[in-house]
């Protein structure tokens, strides 16, 4: 499986999310977040992005570390009810 991770310099959460992804057998493509990358990402997903990391899995913008962690765990019991 592949994940694209948009990162910034000296970003602890970026390092953590890359470790989480690697531990779950993802291949990582890392992109440094700069003005052009930010503009491309916001245009592609029609969303305002203010933080890094930002992770894309299966052409879906998952979000930052906590969103990726929740994505790895799958739906919770309460989500299955609804």
Predicted regions and their residues:
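C-terminal alpha-helical interaction module
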Residues: 2, 7, 43, 75, ...
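Conserved beta-strand scaffold positions in the cores of enzyme catalytic domains, especially
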Residues: 28-30, 61
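Short alpha-helical
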Residues: 12, 36, 63
């Amino acid at each position: 499986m592949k994940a694209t991770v948009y990162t910034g310099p000296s970003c602890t959460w970026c390092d953590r999310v890359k470790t989480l992804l690697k531990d779950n057998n993802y291949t990582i493509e890392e992109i440094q977040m700069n003005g052009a990358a930010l503009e491309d990402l916001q245009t592609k997903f029609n969303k305002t992005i203010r933080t890094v990391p930002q992770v894309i899995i299966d052409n879906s913008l998952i979000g930052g570390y906590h969103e990726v962690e929740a994505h790895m765990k799958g739906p919770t019991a309460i989500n299955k009810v609804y």
